[in-house]
């Protein structure tokens, strides 16, 4: 989800020299937890209104504990903040909602341990945990180096390491080892955000390797794009009810996975076009079924599943097994809601969810 972009920019701004301005940030529980966690680490963040728009002003500086950080059930917070906290002096404790204790975190913890950070997790490799980088007291940076990480359960594992790499002594070269890497567009977003802040990043996708060099980050003045994935339910209304819906400020060029909605919904029968000020979607006479690999855009699955339940032909939504490990089991929830839709309408739910 696009809250990861807000969280990534907050994280990089916390490491940068000067004060960054993040305009039009997405306000959600995830982003609020990230801001609260950064403040616990001593980061100065001011929330203001400029020309009618919300602005976060984030001033980089020395990170320090001790601190107790609530991650809620936010994947970005539980995976992005512990690596950042490893740059801080003092003991940092992390905990969250009961569901957060069940969500995968092991690859991030193991990577931090390889980097020399002490992480106390009771052998569970999950929350709750405390960490401390004892070398920080002596003025030493995390050395960095080559890390192998299995990010097949979440691309956030990889992004979390890349985001702190500029603040290490020799940078980080991260190699993904394991199954297919999900949500590649989110990693592309991380790389672009790093470059926006002045980091040097080399990418070799064939070798599943990302190299981020050490170096100073420079404060930025950024406009955060609207969350395109969140537009999916509203775009679906036009397809289900007829008529048109316009989404304001849809960017013509973006790395967001949600931009694939334009192609996907067109294949399902919608008419979609850019107009002045946004993107207009008009429903067709019928909703068409679709056979599609959603591995890179799993967050779109609930909306596509709902439309598929109302389609005139079967749909096959593939490579979405990793969604069982999100804030909720999104596959089970999608099955529940499409079944409810079937029981409350004369239409047959033709959705087949591939449980890989």
Where are these regions (language model features)?
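Short, structured segments at the rim of ligand-binding sites
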Residues: 1-345, 350
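Polybasic/polar functional segments that serve as interface/processing modules
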Residues: 353-355
């Amino acid at each position: 989800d696009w809250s990861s972009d807000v969280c990534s920019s907050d994280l990089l701004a916390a490491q940068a020299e000067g004060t960054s301005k993040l305009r039009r940030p997405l306000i959600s529980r995830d982003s609020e937890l990230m801001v609260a966690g950064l403040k616990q680490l001593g980061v100065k963040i001011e929330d203001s209104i400029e020309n009618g728009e919300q602005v976060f002003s984030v001033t980089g500086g020395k990170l320090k504990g001790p601190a107790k950080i609530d991650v809620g059930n936010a994947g970005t917070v539980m995976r992005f903040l512990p690596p950042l906290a490893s740059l801080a002096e003092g003991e940092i404790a992390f905990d969250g909602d009961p569901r957060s204790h069940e969500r995968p975190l092991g690859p991030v913890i193991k990577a931090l341990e390889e980097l020399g950070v002490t992480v106390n997790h009771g052998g569970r490799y999950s929350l709750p945990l405390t960490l401390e980088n004892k070398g920080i007291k002596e003025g030493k940076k995390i050395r960095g180096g080559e890390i192998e990480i299995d990010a097949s359960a979440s691309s956030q594992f990889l992004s979390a390491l890349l985001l702190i790499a500029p603040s290490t002594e020799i940078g980080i070269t991260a190699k993904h080892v394991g199954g297919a890497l999900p949500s590649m567009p989110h990693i592309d977003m991380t790389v672009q955000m790093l470059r926006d802040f002045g980091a040097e990043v080399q990418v070799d996708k064939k070798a599943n390797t990302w190299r981020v060099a050490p170096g100073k980050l420079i404060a930025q003045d950024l406009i955060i794009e609207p969350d395109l994935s969140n537009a999916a339910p509203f775009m679906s209304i036009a397809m289900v009810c007829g008529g048109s819906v316009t989404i304001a400020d849809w960017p013509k060029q973006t790395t967001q996975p949600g931009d694939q909605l334009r192609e996907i919904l067109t294949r399902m029968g919608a008419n979609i076009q850019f107009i002045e000020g946004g993107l207009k979607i008009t429903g067709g006479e019928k909703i068409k079924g679709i056979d599609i690999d959603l591995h890179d855009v799993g967050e779109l699955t609930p909306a596509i599943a709902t439309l598929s339940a109302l389609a005139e032909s079967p749909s096959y939504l593939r490579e979405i097994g990793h969604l069982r490990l999100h804030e909720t089991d999104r596959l089970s929830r999608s099955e529940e809601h499409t079944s409810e839709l079937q029981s409350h309408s004369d239409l047959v739910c033709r959705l087949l969810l591939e449980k890989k």
